[in-house]
Amino acid sequence: MVKIGLEVHVHLTSLKTKLFCSCPTEYVGKDPNTITCPVCLGLPGAIPVLNENAVRAAIMVALAINAEIADRVVMVRKHYFYPDMAKNYQISQYDGPGSIAISKGGFIKLRDNKTIRIRRINIEEDPAKIVYPTGSMLTSRYTLLDYNRSGFPLLEIVTEPDMSDPREAREFLEKLRSILEHLGISNPDLEGAMRADANISIEGGERVEIKNIGSPKEVEEALKYEIARQKALVAQGMKVNRETRHWDNAKKVTVLTRSKELEEDYRYFPDPDLPPYTVSFDMIEKIRKELPELPDIRIQRLVKEYGITEYDANVLVIDKSLADLFEETAKNYKNYKKLVNILINDYLRWLNDKNLKPSQSKATTKHLIELLTLLDNGTITIKIAKEILPQIVIEGKMPSEIIKQNSLIAIKDEDYLINVIKEVLSEEKDAVEKAKRDPKVINYLVGKVMKKTSKRADPYIVNELIKKELGI
């Protein structure tokens, strides 16, 4: 039996200042160690002040997952010895004696209706970034630290070990990412904005933690590898040790970093510099009223409003920018089935193949409407539409501009097509005889015609004309 639990660390990218000081959160691209202050650096005597907007963001997430919200925020010191936190403790939260998490309980449902329970949500600060200039963590000759990230406001979302398959872990993270995007508190497309620690055990064995995994896809890969590694150890009669491992995405393996600490090793106790922050009922209700439309509600609305399938609605909503593109385009293009088909089966598939996200695309509503209109009036074929998608996505060129520059307008002249078909039939006599016995072979002949016409012929029309020529 496989048990998987996740600890997800979410950057609150919507916040303008760090969690306990007034340093700006826009550190990406800045020179190392330039966005810091005595609080970020953990200097003696520096007094932290809690950013109230982080509390509001945590309450939004708690409401979105139906969690129980605490009546106060108690920050604790989590002690550990590691260079990414200069003061040798992280200001965080913990659900234990003398402390309380901002929320506990709650759940997220997967597509098969399986419920993944949430244990708690913590508010905490991000540590500094560790840089390995001459290689990886294991091979670099020395290590550098960039404290620009130190103190960045985070939410730690801890699940119960309710997942039993790496695919479920990936789906959970994709669903959580969609919730965060719709709430507008975090931009998951930014590097490092959402990272996960995965805890996994097999057949009642010791728990292994895989730290700091960068994406839902990598979480799935890391867990698949770790399950195979642990099963191999058990098969050899060896013991699975309680330990912390690192996911090497380049080599696609987990690597031992240290023995796993027990919770008591962190020596949690309330931070004396941060008094408890009161969370009132009125504050919670005000935030509840201001919540935007959440993914599950949006999925139901898309199905009802546009008549698309629940599966297609799920695919759209899992990435907010894709769902937004669909709805914006649907205002002026009413063939919703055709629109969702080209978005999911062509546009999204191409992006996934190139490891790109919809937010990285230059395609707009204007591009999509023009592309679909050109298809509808027969100016281009679906094959041409697929062929020009990369130029639309990467360069932002209009479809009409691309087909004009490359002479890609569809061939509608049937007399011309019949001449091309006759030429193909004379060249492919064996295929012609086979086609008369097996109509599926006609697809081969259609392909030959498409090649001769540079994909500018409509394959459906070509198919019908070939049948007519062959008397089928």
Curated annotation (Swiss-Prot):
InterPro entries assigned to the protein according to its UniProt record, in alphabetical order: Asn/Gln-tRNA_amidoTrfase_suB/E (IPR017959), Asn/Gln-tRNA_Trfase_suB/E_cat (IPR006075), Asn/Gln_amidotransferase (IPR018027), Asn/Gln_tRNA_amidoTrase-B-like (IPR003789), GatB (IPR004413), GatB_C_1 (IPR042114), GatB_Yqey_C_2 (IPR023168), Gln-tRNA_amidoTrfase_suB_CS (IPR017958)
Keywords: ATP-binding, Ligase, Nucleotide-binding, Protein biosynthesis
Molecular-function GO term, any one: asparaginyl-tRNA synthase (glutamine-hydrolyzing) activity
UniProt record, GO biological process: glutaminyl-tRNAGln biosynthesis via transamidation; translation
Domain of life: Archaea
Catalytic activity, reaction form: L-glutamyl-tRNA(Gln) + L-glutamine + ATP + H2O = L-glutaminyl-tRNA(Gln) + L-glutamate + ADP + phosphate + H(+); L-aspartyl-tRNA(Asn) + L-glutamine + ATP + H2O = L-asparaginyl-tRNA(Asn) + L-glutamate + ADP + phosphate + 2 H(+)
NCBIfam families reported for this sequence: gatB, PRK05477.1-2, PRK05477.1-4
Similarity remark: Belongs to the GatB/GatE family. GatB subfamily.
Complexes and interactors: Heterotrimer of A, B and C subunits.
Matches recorded under HAMAP family: GatB
Alphabetical list of PANTHER family matching this protein: GLUTAMYL-TRNA GLN AMIDOTRANSFERASE SUBUNIT B MITOCHONDRIAL AND PROKARYOTIC PET112-RELATED, GLUTAMYL-TRNA(GLN) AMIDOTRANSFERASE SUBUNIT B, MITOCHONDRIAL
Full protein name: Aspartyl/glutamyl-tRNA(Asn/Gln) amidotransferase subunit B
Gene that produces this protein: gatB
